[in-house]
Amino acid sequence: MENIQLEHSKPIPAFYCCYLLRSTVRHASLYIGSTPNPARRLTQHNGVVKGGARRTAAEKLRPWEMVMIVEGFMSRLGALQFEWAWQNPGYSRHLRSEEEGLEAPGTTSTTKPKTTRRAKSQTPQPLEFERDPSVSKSLGTPKRKNQRRRRPQRSLTTHFADLHRLLQSPYFSNWPLRIRFFSADVYQSWKAWYDRVDIFLPGHVNILLDGSCPENSAQCSAVGARFGSVEQAKVNYDIIQDYLEKAMFLLDDPKDLSCRVCQTQIAPKEQLAVVCPQAGCHCTCHLLCLSKKFLDAMPEPDCLIPRHGACPACKATVQWSLMMQELSFRSRGEQEALAILKRKRRLDRRQQVISKAKCAGKGVDSSDVRPTSVDLDRSNNNASDDLLLDDDWFDEFASESDSDTGHRSKALSKAAPNLETVVEDSEGDDLEFL
């Protein structure tokens, strides 16, 4: 219970994903995990740094490559739930309910996939059984009760099928998730498999092409921008720092601040307020007012949380998850938000000095200096502008560790306190999500 309360007291993570690894030596060897930092996690699996998983520790299978990820999770707990269900489809209640004929909210098609073959992973196997005296010894020794079960090996297309069914399930179908491919041949395999099924993914689940995949000209939004590679994945809050600065500037002086929906005054210190993420829009609204407006415009009547909506001022389509990420970071991580803006202000000043020098060389007057939009020192008047965050601050703030790391050695358990925390492998049989 304490972990759940701590999870809800943190901001929505800047990035969290479930990933699929493939051995570059043997493509049939696959592994599923979750992480807030794909680049760091991949180095752990490949043994470059400590903290990998037991199933990826074999040197004969290394190096591993991250071929695809499912991103957009709003909490670490949500990513762990999805990871466990993807790893154990035969035991997940989300896929059992889907097999029993429960449709995801908002879906209209009831046609089953053309390929109706049941994957081996979808059939739960008994975890333990007693020895039957009538069974011949030639059949082998039954497993002990406390013996770790062996997960049946699944093919790439089976992982595709399980992922497809999870995204159709009632629990996950309304989450703002996206699938990002880093490997061109894996994307082609997905495309060939997906073309053979009759049920489409929910309309809001986008397919993003990255890495060695061909570029998609339609993939131009901020949330769908290409990383280029796993190592270049944007996993910190820098991607929303301009949005964060604008929101803090608009809400800093609430004297003439009013809700664009209900037209009443907004009290930022007493009420939750959201700001349009569009750069040129200054629309501010009460959280409840805007959510009700978005929900009324959604086609699904039973939806409890909006996915997107049109800004009341600029009419641009804005993502609800992006607005909630900014709101949670502004309200739950104020000190970290101020530190980010301090660093941004310092970089802006440095850029202005460079621009001035270039303009001076060309004889152009460039004395205009953009003033700081927000009083960054209001929470600590003695704080210095040089007090900035370390480069790895997000690794400690967003998540203590990834979902599944290798078992600790005795030496690691006695490591210095400033070393990165390593969590036990998430594949343990004692994990259970109700």
UniProtKB/Swiss-Prot annotation:
Gene3D superfamilies: GIY-YIG endonuclease, Zinc/RING finger domain, C3HC4 (zinc finger). Residues 14-97 form the GIY-YIG domain. InterPro entries: GIY-YIG_endonuc (IPR000305), GIY-YIG_endonuc_sf (IPR035901), Slx1 (IPR027520), SLX1_C (IPR048749), SLX1_endonuclease (IPR050381), Znf_RING/FYVE/PHD (IPR013083). One of its GO terms (cellular component) is Slx1-Slx4 complex. Its EC number is 3.1.-.-. It is an enzyme of class 3 (hydrolase). Its cofactor is a divalent metal cation. The keyword Zinc-finger applies. A zinc finger (SLX1-type) spans 259-314. GO terms for molecular function: 5'-flap endonuclease activity; crossover junction DNA endonuclease activity; zinc ion binding. Keywords: DNA damage, DNA recombination, DNA repair, Endonuclease, Hydrolase, Metal-binding, Nuclease, Nucleus, Zinc, Zinc-finger. Pfam families: GIY-YIG, SLX1_C. Residues 142-153 have a biased composition (Basic residues). GO terms for biological process: double-strand break repair via homologous recombination. Residues 104-113 have a biased composition (Low complexity). The keyword Nucleus applies. It is found in: Nucleus. Its main location: nucleus. Catalytic subunit of the slx1-slx4 structure-specific endonuclease that resolves DNA secondary structures generated during DNA repair and recombination. Has endonuclease activity towards branched DNA substrates, introducing single-strand cuts in duplex DNA close to junctions with ss-DNA. Belongs to the SLX1 family. Forms a heterodimer with slx4. This is Structure-specific endonuclease subunit slx1. It comes from Aspergillus clavatus (strain ATCC 1007 / CBS 513.65 / DSM 816 / NCTC 3887 / NRRL 1 / QM 1276 / 107). The lineage of its organism: Eukaryota, Fungi, Dikarya, Ascomycota, Pezizomycotina.
